[in-house]
């Protein structure tokens, strides 16, 4: 958590925090490399679940296409899976210290973002967590039995 917070606070490219920020950003990239990919895989699996509110096929397609559409190697992993699952276009230009910074979009612009998407993404996240818990319990069971 400390590494992530440090990256969020000073990891951006800024003359004042250049050396400290670069260290925080690179450390965050290393520490979160595997968890970001596991989380994206769980989100894609969750999107294939029951109901028609998510698209597992599009989650996988957008993940493959847009997972590196961010300066950090980890940030767009789950964002791409989520954008595809919900048929949304996320990210894009951002404002830092009053300046607009051009950034790539993640996902296809198939529909506008709406308030109900907060509920939808929470369902997707809960499904992802349950799948992750089941996989951990199965791994624990296998290790315990063998």
What kind of region is each of these model predictions?
Residues 1-146:
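Hydrophobic alpha-helical transmembrane segments
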